[in-house]
Amino acid sequence: MDDKIALTSNDGERPRMKKDWRFWTIFAALMLIAFLAALDMTMISTALPAIVAALPPSSIAANWITSAFLLPMVASQPIFGGLSCSLGRKNSVISALVIFLVGSIVCATAKSVLVLVVGRGVQGLGGGGIHALSEIIMSDLTTLRERGVYFGLIALVFAVAGFIAPVLGGVFSHSSWPWIFWINLPIGAVALVLLVLFLNIRVPLLTGRQKWEKLDLVGNAILFGSVTAVLIAVTEGGIKYRWSDARVWVPLVVGLIGLVAFLMVEWIPGPLCRQPVFPRDLFANRTAAVAYLQTFLHGVIFYGIIYMVPIYFQAIKDRTPLQSAIWSFPLTAPSTPLALIAGLLISISGRYKKLIFIGWALMAGGVGWLTHWSVGTSKAEWAISQIIAGAGIGIMFPITLPPIQASLPVERLEAATAAYAFSRTFGAVWGITGATTIFATQAAKKLRPDYGQLEPLGLNDFTVIAFAESLRYLPEQLQVLVKKVYADAISDSFWLFVPLAIIGFASTFLLKDLPLPDFIKSQAVLEEKGASENASPPESLA
């Protein structure tokens, strides 16, 4: 055998590893798959009206095309955290990538909204694994100090995806929307080959029973069902059914009760859960708990804004999907360099608290300005407000994981990192569904008295979001009325994020600015050439 494992200390701490060509090959593959998952979270936003218009009419609300991706993406992340211990990093990440690519094929070949929603669900299942495992594997290979750089680069991937995804969505919506999904196949194939050939990480040996316990089947089943129920409620509420309808509040109540039951199963010792995916001690540490909260809030704000801004430009400024993506550049462009700069500063200084303060301050100021957008907002105003918000969003991308991992023991690496990925994506669920629901609910409420004129033109409760691209074709008198309603509703949706940004800033006072040591904290080790075959205790290769 030409590749063997290096011996690790009992506490899972090892010196910084040499960054040879194999490390960079693995890192490139992880960046590719992270790019795919991030791309499909946001590319659909600008293309959604065109996709819905191209498919046969359906009673399924358009925002289910988004929600169907987010639901399994959120719920699968803790599952893949457990799988990474039971099946190993390699088998788990390859499985996630294959599932994602299969979902992409289903979406690309869909001839109805129903099939597209199913395909998006399969995509989301794989995307959740990709999101969690890329960060777990990078934590296996880097020290806490240098992790800021590499997570800054991964954050850079998410920022770049947020930057170009709306553009690609706009381009494909005008030519052939299935290419939004076909484009994943060649990129995913390259990453798959690299991972199969070069990713060889050993994890501590587990017995068959321990592997099953690591999966936490009961806890994950409760979590999946609870998230599903909540998402059904927030997706249908105010759009397909009134909030007072039992078909909305019953699943909402059941889902919230289920989330409480999930935490009870996870945190109270018992036979149902021997190896919780969300162990209580992750949140018993104040610094880790605050960092998880901030990760969640960042996900709410970032993904909510990136979905609503293109809708504003399409509906109010008469932009095409492609043009609306270009006009969103001031929001996404600052995120790209600032995510990397923030990661570099953390690696140089070993500190993160001041950067977190700066990130939240910029985000709160920028988001607060967005709430003033109206029909008459000038180019300078919408550009500068996006730049400020985007700067804060970019700074926050790489800097909430280091305090989590620095404050928790090494044996919690997989659970801590999967919970981090879950927190951001769960935030995305609430950000996207919350913002679009507020927008659609407020717009529909104000437009109902005029549905007699609008419904024959295709605008009703079910088409409020999809109709954004078509407002410019309305008769002038109706266009003025509807644009005013849409602008007010979009402003209402932005107000969701203002108190959350303020909470994020205030919670930073509770963080401890822990030092980030320059050693690797992980019980899993990348095989290195030249090591003796018996250099370590028997472990499973995956």
Curated annotation (Swiss-Prot):
Main location class: membrane
The transmembrane segments are 24-44, 51-71, 98-118, 124-144, 151-171, 179-199, 215-235, 248-268, 296-316, 326-346, 355-375, 384-404, 419-439, 490-510
SS bond partners = none
Practical uses of the protein: MELs not only have high potential as eco-friendly biosurfactants due to their excellent surface activity, but also have attracted considerable recent interest because of thei runique properties, including self-assembly, anti-tumor and cell differentiation induction activities, and moisturizing and hair-repairing properties.
**Keyword field:** Cell membrane, Glycoprotein, Membrane, Transmembrane, Transmembrane helix, Transport
Example GO molecular function: transmembrane transporter activity
Instruction: Describe the task this protein carries out.
Output: Glycosyltransferase; part of the gene cluster that mediates the biosynthesis of mannosylerythritol lipids (MELs), surface-active substances that enhance the availability of water-insoluble substrates. MMF1 is directly involved in the secretiopn of MALs.
Q: Which family, according to UniProt? A: Belongs to the major facilitator superfamily.
Q: What is this protein called?
A: MFS-type efflux pump MMF1
What species was this sequence derived from?
Pseudozyma antarctica (strain T-34) (Yeast)
Q: What is the lineage of its organism?
A: Eukaryota, Fungi, Dikarya, Basidiomycota, Ustilaginomycotina
